[in-house]
């Protein structure tokens, strides 16, 4: 079966043919690639084509596809049972491993998705602060829970949605939108509203890769302390991706709550939220903030996460090596764009990298929206034709894995140069 025919059949039974909107390749004007299997840094579609993968399941696969250690842990655990709906030792082991890197956080609760993590973190923060007002930032994506689907990033930006149908005004009336990297817009919210929570991606990855400025994050911490608000860092993407301590490696700010996902599950469906002890004491069964989940902390996902984080902690040069790979790609992009006379902005944070077809530095959502999405679509088409699998949106982040070889990097650089020449 061809990719085109597979997509046609999928659309008969699945809305838009996909289970997550960006996968439909609509923003790049082509049909999606249907994947048969992966191995290392490679993907193989149902037509037998090979691609070097820079999406890596949107971030989780820091050790690439079919990593032997993670596979072994998953298979060994699955043979004992897939899920019990009861406590297991793997939950505690993974909790200890995560918290060892974040000593100011007292406890962690596992869930099954990043959306669950941020949704639960917001509820917990409101319960603790006893205030309903939330500040979120244009272009930051925190999953698809109702109160956070306002000027969100990721697919919401890709498809031009300012919010979502089906979200009542009463749900979002307590969600206040500020401008990323603009502290004055945050201060204005505090002056006019009863704010109990700030949620932010300290390294935004869902409007493209846009790290927050240090002075901006310092000011957020100060405002939360001054007004008695809870500071949530959404590190579903950047946690264990940008570094072994996520954004903390770069900003040294201790958020009150941190959400994790993607890498923490080793490729399985797992996420978490961790908080200071005095906040986490509010969560059920200790306190009155309710949160639960049938598959939360299931043994197979915990085993995958434990294997993934154990490898990370035992690989002292991992993030430096990954950063060098990211820089190699970004330098190839910059050099080829310059030769072609095409404006391009780039960014790197550890194993995360990004680029915008834009003639000005991108510091916020408005800047990102000024990027040339038509040029991006042309570039994406040229790259996938040359066996390079990139995210099908200008507003997503690229990732590298440890399996990515120098040979694959050089093939990528050649594909970049040829693609820019063809634009």
UniProtKB/Swiss-Prot annotation:
Pathway: Porphyrin-containing compound metabolism; protoporphyrin-IX biosynthesis; 5-aminolevulinate from L-glutamyl-tRNA(Glu): step 2/2. The keyword Isomerase applies. Its main location: cytoplasm. It is an enzyme of class 5 (isomerase). The keyword Isomerase applies. One of its GO terms (cellular component) is cytoplasm. PROSITE patterns: AA_TRANSFER_CLASS_3. It holds the Pfam family Aminotran_3. Signal peptide: none annotated. One of its GO terms (molecular function) is pyridoxal phosphate binding. It is found in: Cytoplasm. Its cofactor is pyridoxal 5'-phosphate. It catalyses: (S)-4-amino-5-oxopentanoate = 5-aminolevulinate. Its EC number is 5.4.3.8. GO terms for biological process: protoporphyrinogen IX biosynthetic process. Keywords: Cytoplasm, Isomerase, Porphyrin biosynthesis, Pyridoxal phosphate. Belongs to the class-III pyridoxal-phosphate-dependent aminotransferase family. HemL subfamily. NCBIfam families: hemL (TIGR00713), PRK00062.1 (NF000818). Homodimer. This is Glutamate-1-semialdehyde 2,1-aminomutase. It comes from Campylobacter fetus subsp. fetus (strain 82-40). The gene is hemL.
């Amino acid at each position: 079966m061809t990719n085109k025919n597979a997509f046609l059949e999928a659309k008969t039974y699945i809305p838009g043919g996909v289970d997550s909107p960006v996968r439909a390749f609509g923003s790049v004007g082509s049909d999606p690639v249907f994947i048969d299997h992966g191995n290392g840094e490679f993907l193989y579609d149902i037509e037998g084509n090979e691609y070097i993968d820079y999406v890596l399941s949107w971030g989780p696969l820091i050790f690439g596809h079919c990593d032997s250690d993670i596979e072994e842990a998953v298979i060994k655990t699955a043979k004992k049972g897939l899920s019990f709906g009861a406590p297991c030792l793997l939950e505690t082991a993974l909790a200890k491993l995560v918290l060892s890197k974040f000593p100011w956080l007292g406890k962690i609760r596992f869930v099954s998705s990043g959306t669950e993590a941020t949704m639960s973190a917001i509820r917990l923060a409101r319960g603790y602060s006893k205030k309903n007002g939330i500040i979120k930032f244009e272009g930051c994506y925190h999953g698809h829970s109702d109160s956070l689907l306002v000027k969100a990033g990721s697919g919401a930006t890709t498809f031009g949605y300012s919010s979502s149908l089906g979200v009542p005004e009463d749900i979002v009336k307590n969600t206040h939108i500020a401008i990323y990297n603009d502290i004055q817009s945050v201060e204005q919210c505090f002056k006019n509203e009863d704010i109990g929570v700030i949620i932010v991606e300290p390294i935004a990855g869902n409007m493209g890769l846009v790290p927050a400025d240090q002075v901006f994050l310092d000011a957020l911490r100060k405002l939360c302390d001054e007004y008695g608000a809870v500071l949530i860092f959404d590190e579903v993407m950047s946690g264990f991706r940008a570094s072994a301590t996520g954004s903390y490696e770069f900003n040294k700010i201790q958020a009150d709550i941190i959400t994790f996902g993607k890498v923490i599950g080793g490729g399985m469906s797992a996420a978490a939220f961790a908080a200071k002890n005095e906040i986490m004491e509010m969560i059920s069964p200790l306190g009155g903030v309710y949160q639960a989940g049938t598959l939360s902390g299931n043994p197979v996902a915990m085993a995958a996460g434990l294997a993934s984080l154990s490898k990370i902690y035992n690989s002292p040069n991992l993030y430096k090596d990954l950063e060098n790979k990211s820089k190699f790609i970004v330098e190839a992009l910059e050099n080829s764009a310059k030769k072609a006379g095409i404006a391009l902005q780039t960014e790197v944070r550890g194993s995360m990298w990004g680029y915008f077809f834009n003639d000005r530095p991108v510091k916020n959502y408005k800047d990102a929206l000024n990027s040339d999405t038509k040029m991006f679509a042309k570039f994406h088409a040229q790259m996938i034709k040359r066996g390079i699998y990139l995210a099908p949106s200008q507003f997503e982040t690229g990732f590298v894995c440890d399996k990515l070889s120098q040979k694959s990097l050089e093939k990528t650089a050649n594909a970049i140069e040829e693609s820019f020449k063809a634009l």
